[in-house]
Amino acid sequence: MSERNDPPREGDEPAGAVAGVADEPGTAAHGGGVAIRDDGGDRPGDGAPQEPSGTNEPPESPGHPDDPDDPDARPDARPDADADPDTEDPRHPQPPTPDDRPHATRAGAPAADASAPAQAGEGAGDPAVPLTEDADPRPGTGKLTGTAEHLIARERQRAESRSRRAAGAALVLVGGVILAVAAFTTPWRVLAAGAPAVAPDPARDFSGAQIARAQAFDAATTLPGYISLGLTVLFAGLLVLTPFAAKVLGVLRGPWWVRVLLGVVVLTAITEVLRWPLGMWFETILRDYGLSTQDWAGWTADRLKNTGVSVLLTAVMLLALVALARRVRRWWIPAAVGAFALTLGVSYVYPVVFEPLFNDFTSMPQGSLRSELLAMAERDGVPVEDVLVADASRRTTALNAYVSGFGATRRIVVYDTLLKAPESEVELVVAHELGHAKHADVLDGTLLGGLLAAFGAIGLFLLVGPLRRRTGIASVADPRAIGVLMGLMTLASLVSDPAQNLITRHVEARADVHALDLTRDPATFVAMQKRLAITNISDLSPDAVEYVLYASHPSSPERIALARSWARLNGVPEP
């Protein structure tokens, strides 16, 4: 449950978790890739800038003669016969096509452009030789006629076309599955048809001073949020449309996998250096409004831990992707399967592997509240062995709760700050989280996220090819390609966020209705929403554009209006 629709703040909830009772500001982020999230929550601002550099240049060979893992570093090595026909192996440039290769001259005469020698096809294993129209075509001569070279080039183009058509068909298929899953699992209507409509009205439930404070906080945080968003788009564009990343990463040496790891570290480090001032700016605002309790040492430690998690997850993805591109002809097939599996795996282990890096968790103390919560879960038919309390007060004054994981790792967590609220309001919050658990919202969201990841892997295959010349890379097998991949992933996240937020707003509304059905106490629900909105300084009247693009939860006035509509529908006194 959330009462905010503000610019993203670092780490509102753990990755893989269904958004909780509040998108509180100022907690540790857990993003991946190169996105800047200096201010978690529901406002613009994913991604980080990285400086532009360079102009378009022809691809440089990424191979290194001292690379012991590079087959071409050894004189007797043969190219990989399984190389993807859709992309040039960085170790074996493709021969020029009939339109761009030097025109053949008389027998034995050198080609007109000695700087672009024709080579045998990728995987052919033949030495590069000048080709002439009457070169010796006999077996064993190591030479091809111009006609033979032309046939090889045409066959390669046909194979590339077939591969791209297959990938395009797969992209359409996966996209259709995504739409079907989203349509089937999203609760587009959370109240029965004919439920009395109630219009949200901030002035009915909040004082003028509270509304003014929320507006002032929104204005203060919007500027860094939009600057962050703009820098994200700018940096991702530099990675995708210029040879900046290829030049920066081209100086790295070592086996290909070492260069990939170092490349992720280098690009992430550039991102962090550039986004650090934005993070400090936002943290200062949180302190000014009393939402942050951290000192600068704690804030720095959280950022460094978040960066480490980001580097780890990004490196795993890109190492797998580059390895597949170097070994498998149609690498996008196992890449899509792997992306789906990785998403499920990370969501499953996140509560027990990554969340403890940012908070300490203890069982809720014995007492009437714990007993009532466990009894409520039993009545709801949701098996819950424990309710955990996170030590969020060392970082924030905001109130929140969330459910994360699925299966054996599923758990319900409340912030220790929430325990200061009346027990009846805490029960409403946990009832909301039980709604997420009962409807398997984390699992549904994870499955949808996995399908989106698979869709993205196929999309990378189709997009990287046209960008090779512009970005100065040879193929996805080139370790320098990770810059393009990180940029594309960042842009894909920005483009898909509005659709994902639309879905989560409906999911959160269904969890609200579940809490009302379970407790049948709309008055306490409204009181709890007011407390959350005032404590967390929620945006009570979010801008329409920001709401559509960035709000992952309904606004507090919308949720209060929903409770009143539920009360009218069920014949309960309207709060």
Regions found by a protein language model. Give the residues of each.
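Polar-ligand-bearing catalytic/cofactor-coordination segments
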Residues: 144, 150-171, 180-242, 247-475, ...
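Actinobacteria-biased recognition of intrinsically disordered, low-complexity terminal regions
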Residues: 1-167, 176-179, 572-575
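N-terminal signal-anchor/signal peptide hydrophobic helix marking the start
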Residues: 476-485
